[in-house]
Structure formats: structure tokens, C-alpha cells
Curated annotation (Swiss-Prot):
GO terms for biological process: lysyl-tRNA aminoacylation. It comes from the Bacteria. This is Lysine--tRNA ligase. Transmembrane segments: none annotated.
Amino acid sequence: MLEIWEDAIQSNAWPFVEAKKILDSLNGKTPEKGYILFETGYGPSGLPHIGTFGENARMVMVQKAFEQLSSIPTKLICFSDDMDGLRKVPSNIPNSEMLAQYMDMPLTSILDPFGEYESYGAYMNAKLRSFLDKFGFEYEFYSSTKCYKAGMFDEMLLKVLEKYDEIMELMLPTFREERKATYSPFMPICPKTGKVLQVPIEKWDAKRGTVTYKDEDNNYIEVPVTGGHCKLQWKPDFGMRWAALKVDYEMYGKDHLANARLYSEICRILGGKPPVQLCYELFLDENGEKISKSKGNSISVDDWLKYAPVESMALFMYQNPTRAKRLFFDVIPQNVDAYITFNQKYHLEEDRAKRFANPVYHIHHGHVPKIETFGITYSLLLNLTSVCNPSDKSVLWGFISKYAPKATPNTTTYLDRLAEFAIRYYDDFIKAHKSYYTPSEKHKVILRDILDMLSSISEETEGEVIQKSIYDIGMKAGYENLRDYFKDLYQILLGQNEGPRLGTFIKLYGIKEMKKLIERKL
């Protein structure tokens, strides 16, 4: 364990950095409950999305890193805020107009518009669990409704009542004057309608364990705060939950950062110890704007998995969680190729600290599969697809088999999947945007020089040799910036502004095929 500790700390990989923070917070002691509790949250008003995957994937990376550094048992819970009242009717579900009658009702008290479960909240919870199970996450599921109604939070809810004034002193300065007049940490559940009420509390009684409010008929209604008769506002709820469940580690998006101090302070007021926390940045679209489900400027998990393996998505989540990242379709090929590079480096590396620093160690929790692509990248396959416009992957395999005779669809399954992904990505994102440049007389001279060079070499010539020869032709052509030279070649030959190392690409595509392509352009 000591050797692993030293190498893990030396690696400076962020999951190990976070795991050490948890250990430091324990002062060398195992918690009284006997385990370390990691918590992720889910708002079941909408379907699980790529952010849900990201938070859970990152959380498990920290959990597994902690398990490498300590023998203290761990547990991960996914907490669903399914007792929240419906504040807005979602537009992207069937029978959405039916939900309008359930405004302010707890999500678990609303009929399922899909007709599959006992409630809308239950439907969304089932989707979450199915989603997490699909990716192999090991977790315990907690329902806010069940926790409140089963009395799991009763002790802490009575403490909130005891500390009512102190909590109000903390919360009120954060609101505008209008909200200050009506705010209370408790939201009673209306005995008549079942709605979650945001009403002023007229009286609170710590001894009786009740709060009193006025209903719409101006009658005073007294309800217990325990047993699911009240729910806390979301900010106090966060801190109360930390105290009640004794959460040791939580991560949340930047949209929570301004309130994190409140969560922690409420946890302390209730006698709890706030968890170690990580605030991760939110995703941006290609224009640098915040991603919004309502705007439709995001990528769904299904979108990503249509074009790339899941580990490439996990790599995107691993990289720099505290830095804002653009999430759009162009990042998919980049992350696939980055994953391939990291995977190859991992298996060549003998230094354990450097292995610990490699993202694939954390993506696969220390059990990294060895993949073989014979030097063929996703980007290279996209460019190959671009010139041969295949109807299915067997066309690509015709070129792959010549380039790497040992590779077959059955033995090189990762590469086979990439070929399939590449065709889908090309069809959906590249094909419609291709724009070929008509070669000028100067370009025709260059193309003839490349054609002569290719005619003078054999099929066995290495890609690097071909690359250098093409480079030399560009130098001879008098380009001040060779990036412009290669850009011209990409536009003429591939119909795009960027492309692969041409030597490697020609080796994969075949010298004979490349000569035919150039002849067509001439």
C-alpha cells in the first residue's frame, strides 16, 4: 500500500489528488459508520443526459482511486430528488399537456405519462437506474420520497426546527426583499391537494415537531415536519442530506458553486461535517455558450455512442474536470484518437507513477484492456472513408487488410468497431460539407511531381518516406508556409481543410489507388 501511495501521489492524477483530500479529512480514522460515502445527485424532472454520465464516471474514478490508497470500505449512492414539486411542464415527452394539472405536485405523485410506472418520478428513476446499469456503475439508489416518508431524515428535520432561527439568519441575506417575506426552509405537503407548498410559515414548534401555515382559505394548518409531511427547500435539503447520511465526498457543477457555502454551513449547524467537495465546470457548445437541453445545443449519450466507443466519452469526462470544455461533434474523433494514444502509451510504460498518471488507468479502474489498431487512427479511417465513400465497412477492410495483413474484423474487434463508427460519422457530418478545390496550373505541377514520385516507389515503401518526399515537393514549390501547401492538397484531394499525414494515409489507401485519385484531379 505504501508503494502504491507514493506512486499515486507522484502521479498527480486528479482522482488520486481528490482521494488524498478525503483521507486527509479523516485524520487517519475510519468514520464511525464504517465506510466512506460518495454521493451523486439526480433531478428526475428530465431524462439522464451526458452530464449524468460525466458526474457518475468521475465520481467512480475518485472512489476507485481512494480504494487504491486505503482499506476503508466505500459506498456510492445516487440520490434522486424525486420529491421535488413539478415546476415546469416538460415539452419533450408524450401527453405533456396532461402534466399541467400536476403543477407543484411531488414527481412521485404524478401519473406516468408514458404509462409504464406508478408515477412520473418512478419512470425517470427507472431510466436513471437503467442508464447507470448500462455503463456498469456500482451504486445504491436512494429516493428522496422514500427517505422522507420512511423517517430516514426525521432526526435532522427536527434539528432544522430547533435551529430554525439560525438557518433563517443564514438564508435570508441571500434573497431579495420580496422573497425574504415568504421564505421558510420547510415546504409543507398540502394534506388536501398533495402539493409541495412554498408558503410563509406562521409558527414553528420544536417541541411538537410541527410548522403552521395558512391555506388558501385563510385557515391555519399545522403539520409535522417528519414522516414526509414536509420537504426542505433545495439548499437546506442539500446540507441536511449531508448531515443525515454522513456524506464524505460530493461533486457538483459550477451552477452550485455559489450555494456550496450554504450547504456546508447548514450541515455544520445540524451537527454534521461537510464532505470533501469538487466543483466541476459545465460544458460549452462550439460557440462557447453554455449548453442547454432546451436550446438543443448539446450532444446526448446516444449521439456519442453512435459514433464512438464509450471509453472515448469517459476520456472526455476525465480530462480537466475543473476547466470549461466545448462539447460538440468535432470533439468525438479527437477523443477516440487520444484514447488510442493513451492506451498504447500505458502498455509500453513500466513506471507505475506514469501509469497512474495515464487517463486510461482511471477510465478502466486499473484494468486496462490492450487494444491493437496497427497504427490506424479514427481520423485516418474518416479520411479513408472520405475518398472511397463506402456503403459498408467491408470496403474499408479491403484497404485495412492490405495495410495490416494481420488485422481481421474477428481478431481486431476494436478496429472493426472504429470502421463502422467512421462510416456513420462521415455520412452524418463530413459528406454534406465536402468542398473540392479545383487545382490551378501551379497545383497541377505539384500533383504531377507527387504522381511521378509515387510511380518511382514500391508498395512496400514506408509511410514516413512517402511523407518526406511530399514535404520536399512542397519545399521545391516555393510555399512560405507548408501548412498552406498541405491545406491545398487536402482541399484538392479530400475536399476538406484538414487531413492526415499524407504518407500514412497513402500507405493505408494504397499507392496505386492514390495515383488514380491524383489522375482524376488532373
